[in-house]
Amino acid sequence: MQINKFLLFFLSILILTSCSKNVVEDSVLKEKSLDLQVLEAYQEGKEYLENGDPLFAAKKFNEAEILFPQSEWAPKSALMAAYSYYSYDYLKDAIAELDRFLKIYPKYKNLDYVYYLLGISFYEQIVDEKKDLQSIIKAKQYFEKV
């Protein structure tokens, strides 16, 4: 009797598992490669910047940097994000992005451009040279590094 119950249990499990499908569906559309995603995000950022939307441009450039942080596109994307902010007078955002850039990529080959952009961002923040010297001093420091 014990053997019959075991056999009945085993057969029922066997029948139930044989009825289930384990089909892997192949999609016609494959996932995009990471390189392609980085390039697309970078291109979208350029398009947003050309169309006058610096915030979405910076967001796309940052997305490109995040997707592939060890690629050659990462520092370019971070720099373009900072330029996006600068080009539409979001100077504090540009400065923050450039400071972050200097911390992450201290040996980047075009650091002179980063220092120039930092200097010009501080220079353009000068409202009254008699009241606030902080922007003048910072601009001078960064221009001296160029």
Q: What would you call each of these model-derived segments?
A:
Residues M1-C19:
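Sec-dependent bacterial lipoprotein signal peptides
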Residues S18-V146:
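Acidic, polar-rich low-complexity tracts and alpha-helical solenoid repeat scaffolds
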